[in-house]
UniProtKB/Swiss-Prot annotation:
<dbReference type="Pfam" id="PF15032">
    <property type="entry name" value="DUF4529"/>
</dbReference>
<dbReference type="GO" id="GO:0005654">
    <property type="term" value="C:nucleoplasm"/>
</dbReference>
<dbReference type="GO" id="GO:0005829">
    <property type="term" value="C:cytosol"/>
</dbReference>
<protein>
    <recommendedName>
        <fullName>Uncharacterized protein C16orf46 homolog</fullName>
    </recommendedName>
</protein>
<feature type="region of interest" description="Disordered">
    <location>
        <begin position="136"/>
        <end position="157"/>
    </location>
</feature>
<dbReference type="InterPro" id="IPR027836">
    <property type="entry name" value="DUF4529"/>
</dbReference>
<feature type="compositionally biased region" description="Polar residues">
    <location>
        <begin position="136"/>
        <end position="153"/>
    </location>
</feature>
Amino acid sequence: MDLCEESETFLENKENKKIEDAEETALTFHCPDERSERNHVCCLLGVSELTLEEDGRASEFTISTGWEEAVHGWGRTSPTACIWSKKKVRRGRVGEGTSGGSNCLFCMSLSQGSLEPRPLSAAGKLEEAAVAEVSSQKNWGSEKNWNSPSQGPASREPNKLCFPTYLHGEKKSLQMKEFIWCMEEWGIPEAVSSKACRNPSSSTDQGLSISDAVATKALVVLPPLKSSSHNLDSLSKKSRNIFWQPEEKVLGVEKDECMACPDELKGVDGKGEKAHFELASRLKVTNILPFPPTVTRTHLLSAESQRCCLHWSLLPQKSSVFPPNPTNIHYLATLQVLGQQGGQNCRTRLKAKEAKPPRTTPKHIVTEAKQESRPHVLESKVFPKPLLPSLTVSRVVIPVSTHRVL
């Protein structure tokens, strides 16, 4: 009996040992060290960071609402993206404005203060009032009659404000104003002006054509120079009839003056009348001719063209009839200085060392020389109005609300 009890206790102890060994091996298999636990936690943290990055990339393409989200997400979205409001804006009627068609706060703020659609009959009155306002704001010295009956409606087109005309069923665009100011008159052909005078602007089709014409003329920098050639020819003909002298007389005067004073200034008699005549004849040849081939006049024209920025072929080509001579240029400069100082300085400084035989001159030439003894200044009549460009200024005003967009 004792042997049987010992064997049973031995077997029970073995089984208990096996169970304890199995539990210890299971514990050591699941968590053998602390390093494995740390590695497992690091893997979980890495997965969470990856998910956060993916969520952030997905939110970059969404347009956020609110002021802070708009400021933070402005670099993520395009600069032309619209900020949409959460509240539902009521739908407007057709042709009422841009607020009914879209709920964009930025577009709604731009469209505030725009013109309401008005009939075409009232548009003409608005244009006339705008012409009066523009003419009152100008501070130029030119006094012109913009609303004179001689000018047709086509000539007053550049002075009007371009108010947009809306048709039925068409939505209103942003407020756009075009201020077109003209210092000089536009060169309009006679056929167009006669047609404009015969057909007054009363129908709706002509109102639309006026706005189109203003829009096309806003792109033109310089007016057409069609009437400039006629005025230039008439000016040259008048100047030839009044001031032109034959080449023989001019050459004779130059020869006499060069023979009289080759090195220094040589006066004539002590009376001073012939000195006045020489001074006036030289100034008449140099300063009064429309386009002479001398040095002083071309210098004035080049300075005037550089001041006005006129890149046209106004200056004539150099001709070989009058070759430049340094003695003549020096003599001209001294004569101009003498003409400015007066007749007394002419008598004192133009004293001859060698006597010169008196020459007979007609009386009417002497009287003209006395009247024109002063140097002739370049007048503005040399350049007619069609040659000068008219200044056009086009400006587009888009009103933006100053309040913060929410």
